[in-house]
């Protein structure tokens, strides 16, 4: 799957994880990738099982029931330099890069796996978090496919 520059947002700030997840979902909805109902399913998914993946990465995506709201596969990349906490005050899980995902069928599972492998190397995450342009992000993530 190709990364679209209009779905890459740099230097974002969020008060909490729900705002961050909603932002990712709204990008997908605005781009015609999902119905607006998918956004709430992304929030629900995180409540059921955290979308925080470790290494400063979160991968918000919808519940299985929300697959009906996916119009086409898409992925957002949202850089949050100050981070957003996906954990608790006592057990913070801070993400500096978010990948909002909508996939037709089981396509999102492969996308999540590829991103997880790429981001297992924290140096790759640091490069994404430090990227200055959308083109730089696209170039870094060209290794994911």
Swiss-Prot record:
One Pfam family hit: PTS_EIIA_2
GO biological process assignments: phosphoenolpyruvate-dependent sugar phosphotransferase system
Keywords per UniProt: Cytoplasm, Kinase, Phosphoprotein, Phosphotransferase system, Sugar transport, Transferase, Transport
TM segment ranges: none
Residues modified to Phosphohistidine: 61
Major site of localization recorded for this protein: cytoplasm
Domain PTS EIIA type-2, chain residue ranges per copy: 1-144
Annotated protein name in UniProt: Mannitol-specific phosphotransferase enzyme IIA component
Source species of the chain: Streptococcus mutans serotype c (strain ATCC 700610 / UA159)
Lineage start: Bacteria, Bacillati, Bacillota, Bacilli, Lactobacillales
Gene that produces this protein: mtlF
